Swiss-Prot record:
This protein's GO CC annotations: cytosolic large ribosomal subunit
Entry-linked SUPFAM superfamilies: ClpS-like, Ribosomal protein L7/12, oligomerisation (N-terminal) domain
The name this protein goes by in its record: Large ribosomal subunit protein bL12
Any Pfam family matching the protein: Ribosomal_L12
Residue ranges the record marks as coiled coil: none
Similarity comment text for this entry: Belongs to the bacterial ribosomal protein bL12 family.
Function, in words: Forms part of the ribosomal stalk which helps the ribosome interact with GTP-bound translation factors. Is thus essential for accurate translation.
């Protein structure tokens, strides 16, 4: 399998399948793909009114509330992001703050799929 074939196969995977792949790679090679969650400045924020008139192509999935199903939301966040239990719990506990970004700079379709998964788990989610 060439590198291009591997990349194409990964592109065709769902978010849940990618999370499973990351977990399997972590176990196989004894590494952790977890990284500290960093909040970056939103691209185009300084663009002003002209940037707002253009249709958005990149979205951030922001957790507004975990409702009364915190454990289910933590599990969903882990599956979506590939974070470890501690990191996912810390991220979920930031719900309602600007730091509660689950995914950044993703397509509208991927953002809506993630929003659907989180809402099914009991979370309140916003796309920005």
């Amino acid at each position: 399998m060439t590198k291009e074939e591997l990349i194409q196969a990964i592109k065709e995977m769902t978010v849940a399948e990618l999370a499973e792949l990351v977990k399997a790679l972590e176990e196989e090679f004894g590494v952790s793909a977890s990284a500290p969650v960093a909040v970056a400045a939103m691209p185009g924020a300084a663009g002003g009114q002209a940037a707002q008139e253009e249709e958005k192509t990149e979205f951030n999935v922001v957790l507004k509330s975990f409702g009364d199903k915190k454990i289910a939301v933590i599990k969903a966040v882990r599956a979506i992001t590939g974070l470890g239990l501690k990191e996912a719990k810390e991220l979920v506990e930031k719900a309602g703050s600007p730091d509660a970004i689950i995914k950044e700079g993703i397509s509208k379709s991927e953002a809506e799929e993630i929003k659907k998964q989180l809402e099914e788990a009991g979370a309140e989610v916003e796309l920005k």
